[in-house]
Amino acid sequence: MFKFALTLTLCLAGSLSLAQHNPHWWGNRNTIVHLFEWKWSDIAQECESFLGPRGFAGVQVSPVNENIISAGRPWWERYQPISYKLTTRSGNEEEFGDMVRRCNDVGVRIYVDVLLNHMSGDFDGVAVGTAGTEAEPRKKSFPGVPYTAQDFHPTCEITDWNDRFQVQQCELVGLKDLDQSSDWVRSKLIEFLDHLIELGVAGFRVDAAKHMASEDLEYIYSSLSNLNIDHGFPHNSRPFIFQEVIDHGHETVSRDEYKDLGAVTEFRFSEEIGNAFRGNNALKWLQSWGTGWGFLPSGQALTFVDNHDNQRDAGAVLSYKSPRQYKMATAFHLAYPYGISRVMSSFAFDDHDTPPPQDAQERIISPEFDEDGACVNGWICEHRWRQIYAMVGFKNAVRDTEITGWWDNGDNQIAFCRGNKGFLAINNNLYDLSQDLNTCLPAGTYCDVISGSLIDGSCTGKSVTVNENGFGYIHIGSDDFDGVLALHVDAKV
């Protein structure tokens, strides 16, 4: 009997963790966008007017819980909780719930960035949060939850990143480190996440996951409610979990400890794709992209060119500040069948602490758009760049197909098919790509969705005529505005 019960428990745990890798996308949609620091009312409108019609699968939103108010309102104040009240500069609980409902209604899922590792860092005196709640972080007193000093690990600093104890029980950049093994802390975290599930979210991005013991997270995840069927989720659906674990391959706390609990952010993907498209590694080597590069298995990897943290760091990572290379890297990211894809939607920044666009009263302002739909008032909105949202459509069109017909010039010109549904070519050399290539597509004329669109039966940009053998003449000039060309069956004239 004991053996049967143990087997049943292990089977249930395994099925729960497997279910936590399912992002619950509608239809053939399969790309998440991070609308970093957007207001809830603006996200709701964006779901209805742009994301839904363009085939985006979901939105990662900024932290929803009350946070400390920091001078100048830097973006990172959102990562310093004061309570679990749903009031931030993005809006209140009513506005959040309205956004979730409206986005779900048009097939766009919501994933919340959640802070389970810590509360706010030190603050002189009494800190006031975005919902008006008072706290004394230096005393580890957070009455809005409530938490007291006994709910935290003893104060210590991380000085040795190879020391598991320090990484998981000391304070990350001075943030008060919660004790997730405590029954009270677990209950408050589960209560917070369950409230968001009741409001209709599809899952969570777990910030600083590597700073929490995997067994504590496993307990918390397995204790969560199923997703709310009133928002279109099937019965017994589990929340999608993706966890921030920075692992460059030599970490004491490894991504492998978390990959079975949910997806894991594959930071090596971001670094290596930046290296390649900056010219530090020939694109020809991308043929074995994915697990061939030592990355996580595809279904366990949350992939991205950049995120809100590493776009602010020096190094190989590409961001909107290198637009030509960034668009090529994003096209490859969305065309190559590896990982659970997320694209970034940023605001402009000059330094690490730049706040989101705000008015004189430090209220976040709504994005404004020009006649082409691009953002103009401090919001970058990469997801509205034609070269990026067109590749979201490409990714939808080729879903469930594999790479075929890989071609390269032995250097930085590459091309490949996705079954017989799509074709991508990239030129990162300083000379033209001019070649008859096998597109694997049925005969006909196709619009290049990078340089233009299919409108009223004609292409506004380049077009490629494919013959009966699937071949077409591909030209990407070294000085073309974009170094990439993409064709797919839904853009056939």
Swiss-Prot record:
Ca(2+) binds at N117, Q168, D177, H211. It is found in: Secreted. CDD domains: AmyAc_bac_euk_AmyA. Its EC number is 3.2.1.1. Disulfide bonds join C47-C103, C156-C170, C375-C381, C417-C440, C447-C459. It holds the Pfam family Alpha-amylase_C. The modification Pyrrolidone carboxylic acid is found at Q20. GO terms for cellular component: extracellular region. The keyword Disulfide bond applies. Keywords: Calcium, Carbohydrate metabolism, Chloride, Disulfide bond, Glycosidase, Hydrolase, Metal-binding, Pyrrolidone carboxylic acid, Secreted, Signal. Residues 1-19 form the signal peptide. It catalyses: Endohydrolysis of (1->4)-alpha-D-glucosidic linkages in polysaccharides containing three or more (1->4)-alpha-linked D-glucose units. The active site is at D207, E244. InterPro entries: A-amylase/branching_C (IPR006048), A-amylase_C (IPR031319), Alpha_amylase (IPR006046), Glyco_hydro_13_cat_dom (IPR006047), Glyco_hydro_b (IPR013780), Glycoside_hydrolase_SF (IPR017853). GO terms for biological process: carbohydrate metabolic process. The record marks D309 as: Transition state stabilizer. GO terms for molecular function: 4-alpha-glucanotransferase activity; alpha-amylase activity; metal ion binding. Binds 1 Ca(2+) ion per subunit. Binds 1 Cl(-) ion per subunit. The keyword Glycoprotein does not apply. Changing W293L: In strain: Seychelles-7 and Seychelles-8. Chloride binds at R205, N307, R342. Its cofactor is Ca(2+); chloride. Monomer. Belongs to the glycosyl hydrolase 13 family. This is Alpha-amylase-related protein. It comes from Drosophila sechellia.
